[in-house]
A protein has these predicted regions:
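Aromatic, loop-rich ligand-recognition surfaces of beta-strand-rich domains
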Residues: 1-7, 29-32, 37-121, 130-182
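Polysaccharide-binding surfaces and accessory modules of carbohydrate-active proteins
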Residues: 10
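Short linear Ser/Thr-Pro motifs
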Residues: 18, 22-27, 111
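Residue-level structural signal for beta-strand termini and adjacent loop
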Residues: 123-125
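Low-complexity/repetitive intrinsically disordered segments
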Residues: 183-187
Length: 187
């Protein structure tokens, strides 16, 4: 879907979901709001600033208030109006010549307020081909309303460069309460 954006704060909002990338290489063309548009073709996704040479450079940001402490790496966060128990995430690379800039390793965090985070998963060794998604499973039984994906390494092993993703999908189950039945949720 289409997010309403605030370029000054790098914040995007749609139907109660709030998405915030840690940086953007080109805020007008690759701000990150297209990570949730269901399209992984060329020209759709998010590019971070130049923060990698295989692994994250010391100049890369760090997700604050994480337990255990988050590693250095560009990150994206999403806040939802409802808590879910996350079962897994799927990420796809930017398409075309950008598949080598996709996440190769990283960590997943959950939170309740968008300010404090708990590690709930990790991944490594990812490679990609055009149109391919990689899945990251989580084992947490806790329901969270906020999630973060921290990228610690990219697939490009030759050049210092930015990180790019074409699509970020989250799958889980809504918290049961107030007379509601649990339902599958996809963001």
């Amino acid at each position: 879907g289409k997010f309403e954006s605030n370029p000054t704060t790098n914040t995007f909002v749609q139907a109660g979901d709030t998405f915030i990338p840690s940086s953007s290489l080109n805020p007008s063309d690759w701000p990150g709001d297209e990570l949730f548009d269901g399209h992984i073709g060329a020209g759709s996704g998010w590019l971070s600033e130049n923060s990698y040479h295989v692994t994250a450079l010391s100049s890369a940001p760090t997700l604050p208030n994480a337990s255990p402490s988050a590693p250095i790496g560009e990150y994206v966060t999403i806040g939802m109006p409802t808590k879910i128990r996350l079962s897994h995430m799927r990420i796809a690379p930017l398409q075309g010549t950008y598949t080598t800039n996709a996440p190769a390793a990283g960590k997943i965090y959950g939170g309740l307020d968008g300010a404090n985070w708990t590690e709930i998963g990790s991944f490594s060794g990812f490679t990609y081909t055009t149109g391919q998604y990689n899945s990251i499973n989580t084992t947490s039984s806790v329901y969270y309303s906020h999630f973060a994906l921290v990228v610690t390494a990219i697939t490009n092993t030759t050049n210092g460069t930015w990180m790019g993703m074409g699509e970020w999908e989250l799958y889980g189950y809504e918290e049961v309460g107030a007379g509601d039945d649990s339902v599958d949720t996809t963001v």
